[in-house]
Amino acid sequence: KINKNSLILYDDRITIKKDLSDYFKELNLNSIKKLIINFDPNLKFKKKHITYDLNYRNQLVYNSNNLKIYNDSKCTNLNNAIYKNNLINSVNKILILGGKFKKQDKNLKYNITNTLVLIFGSQKDLFINQLKFIHSNYFKFNNLNELFKFLKLIIKFNKYEFILFSPGGESYDSYKNYLDRGNHFNQLIKKVLL
């Protein structure tokens, strides 16, 4: 036997849902309104609260009057590495690429202009095949340690303004992760410059 007083009609359930929904929308709007009304325009935010501190993402690791070195070990995409390199407005720059190559469209070639490109790792030829060198040269190395022996010589005898370590490949070929690779790069920079 069904008690008629305990039944909620279908239309009544819809009405109750709508009323609850309207109530929470109004409650939300009132909360936002309070925030806006009470907002202090002189409020200062600490930088770390509004930005992400990603290790080895465009990290300036060396800065002298003549040379800036950036560690962007987090970059695992060739397109991003080339894009960042092209943002540097200088003909005296070095781009360091390497790592485990991510598959790309074989017909797509990235233009690299006015740059000395140093490429390390077992898949260095895959990187070279994706690049179109315009007023640029490249050298290949088996690993980052070999690359740094060469780098030490060329920065001693040539004037470069920028060195960008933006590998454009994954780190798993030789490192535990991009943090491990970025840390290794920073250690090698200290050895070369000191």
Regions found by a protein language model. Give the residues of each.
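Short glycine-rich anion-binding loops that position phosphate/pyrophosphate groups of nucleotides
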Residues: 76, 99-102, 123, 164-172
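Glycine/aspartate-rich loop-and-adjacent alpha/beta segment that forms the canonical ThDP
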Residues: 167-194
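Hydrophobic packing residues within well-ordered alpha-helices of enzyme cores
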Residues: 81-84, 127-131, 185
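Nucleotide phosphate-binding/pyrophosphate-handling subdomain across enzymes
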Residues: 13-115
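C-terminal helical cap/extension that packs against the catalytic core
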Residues: 23, 104-162
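Short, hydrophobic beta-strand segments that form beta-sheet elements in well-ordered domains
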Residues: 1, 6-8, 95-96, 116-122
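Alpha-helix N-cap recognition
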Residues: 77, 143-146, 177
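Flexible active-site lid/hinge loop adjacent to a nucleotide/diphosphate
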Residues: 1-21, 173-179
